[in-house]
């Protein structure tokens, strides 16, 4: 397990982009990921048995996508996370780490690390997120983790990362998820972007459809951004990371300030009560970043970024198409009642014009 100094560095690690995450506790910078051997978590099997990235693609392309079984987090409590519980496991879970061959590291977030794993019995390849129980206790994450799991288990959509199962042992909680072979949209954007209208419109349509599905279930994502969109085969993208997602009963409003600075909506900054329209605004920011290469309101300081967001200070390069400008301008509207609906996004001329070329 990482010591406190290492953990502190990970939480505050800065990437090239000045974009920071707002969660009431400080900043969390974008972190670069690099594949490497799993540290701190071992399945007891030779990692050489995991397919190479090329073979991994073939396995994922052909494998049947079906759940491996679910073990409830209801057994998890602050008491069960205490140091005394680390002596011997007494949990009755359907899955354990021994059921998997652990391969390359896919990424590392503020809390937890994600690995490519292969289910020994079925050969099923997934992404496994391992979160230290000590960190869950230290940062009071149990309630948020349970909410994230409950929300993700209740969703079934082709553009939302599937949570197959979850289990825990003496030291860690594990989330077994769908593996998207081509990684973050953010990395693709920085390496290959900005994107042309055909590709950008394809991505925006899929995310709009995922958000439309979530909103019908009264779920707000609250952290839509390129880092939380994963790319699979054939440019199919999937919305991921539901750590800030919340169930929002009809007619109710939220007040919590959370998300990423460049993607915050005016109503969240003010601050005042907000609803699922914060996701619609974020979709507009995402559309802009995909076709321009940078967020529309990005500045060197949080204060300047906030000012531009509140003024909706939107500027387009001359290279951006008329239809793309129109869609983005109709999403990035200060008045929440005047923003284009997600249905309107999916039937917008920019989408319909490019759809035949997807």
Curated annotation (Swiss-Prot):
Native species: Candida glabrata (strain ATCC 2001 / BCRC 20586 / JCM 3761 / NBRC 0622 / NRRL Y-65 / CBS 138) (Yeast)
Claim: Membrane is one of the keywords in the record: no
Gene Ontology biological process terms in this record: attachment of spindle microtubules to kinetochore; homologous chromosome segregation; meiotic sister chromatid segregation; meiotic spindle checkpoint signaling; mitotic DNA integrity checkpoint signaling; mitotic spindle disassembly; negative regulation of protein import into nucleus during spindle assembly checkpoint; regulation of cytokinesis
Places the protein is found: Nucleus; Cytoplasm, Cytoskeleton, Spindle; Chromosome, Centromere, Kinetochore
Protein name: Aurora kinase
Active site positions: 223 (proton acceptor)
One MF term in the entry's GO annotations: protein serine kinase activity
UniProtKB keywords: ATP-binding, Cell cycle, Centromere, Chromosome, Chromosome partition, Cytoplasm, Cytoskeleton, Kinase, Kinetochore, Nucleotide-binding, Nucleus, Serine/threonine-protein kinase, Transferase
Main localization category: nucleus
């Amino acid at each position: 397990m990482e010591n406190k100094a290492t953990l502190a560095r990970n939480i505050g690690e800065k990437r090239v982009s000045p974009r920071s995450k707002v969660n009431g506790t400080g900043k969390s910078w974008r972190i670069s990921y690099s594949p490497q051997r799993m540290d701190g978590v071992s399945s007891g099997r030779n990692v050489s048995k995991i397919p190479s990235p090329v073979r991994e693609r073939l396995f994922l392309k052909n494998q049947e996508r079906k759940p491996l079984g679910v073990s409830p987090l209801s057994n998890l409590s602050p008491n069960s996370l205490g140091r005394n519980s680390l002596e011997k496991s007494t949990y009755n879970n359907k899955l354990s780490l021994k059921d998997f061959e652990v391969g390359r590291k896919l990424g590392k977030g503020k809390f937890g690390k994600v690995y490519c794993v292969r289910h020994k019995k079925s050969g099923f390849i997934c992404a496994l997120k391992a979160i230290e129980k000590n960190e869950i206790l230290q940062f009071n994450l149990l309630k948020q983790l349970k909410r994230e799991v409950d929300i993700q288990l209740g969703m079934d959509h082709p553009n939302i990362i599937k949570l197959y199962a979850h289990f825990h042992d003496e030291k860690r909680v594990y989330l077994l998820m769908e593996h998207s072979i081509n990684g973050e949209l953010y990395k693709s954007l920085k390496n290959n972007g900005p994107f042309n209208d055909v590709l950008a419109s394809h991505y925006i349509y899929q995310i709009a459809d995922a958000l439309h599905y979530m909103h019908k279930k009264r779920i707000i994502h609250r952290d839509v951004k390129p880092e939380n969109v994963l790319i699979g085969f054939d440019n199919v993208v999937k919305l991921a990371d539901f750590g800030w997602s919340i169930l929002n009963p009809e007619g109710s409003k939220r007040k919590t300030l959370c998300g990423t600075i460049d993607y915050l909506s005016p109503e969240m900054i003010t601050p005042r009560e907000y609803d699922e329209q914060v996701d619609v605004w974020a979709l507009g920011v995402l559309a802009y970043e995909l076709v321009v290469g940078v967020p529309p309101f990005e500045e060197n300081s949080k204060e300047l970024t906030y000012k531009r967001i509140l003024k909706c200070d939107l500027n387009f390069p001359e290279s951006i198409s008329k239809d793309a400008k129109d869609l983005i301008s109709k999403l990035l509207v200060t008045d929440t009642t005047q923003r284009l609906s997600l249905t309107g996004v999916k039937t917008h001329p920019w989408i319909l014009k490019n759809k035949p070329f997807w």
